[in-house]
């Protein structure tokens, strides 16, 4: 499945450039970097000078694809990465 704005929430996020554009915690707004790790509840972004752990459920992320920037509500990403990206079986993400 190609990486498009419609399919982004079902893809592997590690390696994508990302920025926090909205969040319940104003301290994390504006954090940007490359996604280096993903867990069920967190995205880990590596910036120029440090590594940030941002909760998925309380933020909106802007992912930079090669052709455009895609906004994704973090609530859509809250799931085990393997479960969220699976292609077979009964899945809420399919």
Swiss-Prot record:
GO molecular function: ribonuclease P activity; RNA binding
Pfam families per the UniProt record, alphabetical: RNase_P-MRP_p29
Location(s) in or outside the cell: Cytoplasm
A biological-process GO annotation: tRNA 5'-leader removal
Origin superkingdom: Archaea
Top enzyme category: hydrolase
Keywords per UniProt: Cytoplasm, Endonuclease, Hydrolase, Nuclease, tRNA processing
EC number: 3.1.26.5
InterPro entries: RNase_P/MRP_Rpp29_sf, RNP1, Rof/RNase_P-like, Rpp29/RNP1
Complex and partners: Consists of a catalytic RNA component and at least 4-5 protein subunits.
Family recorded in the similarity comment: Belongs to the eukaryotic/archaeal RNase P protein component 1 family.
Protein name: Ribonuclease P protein component 1
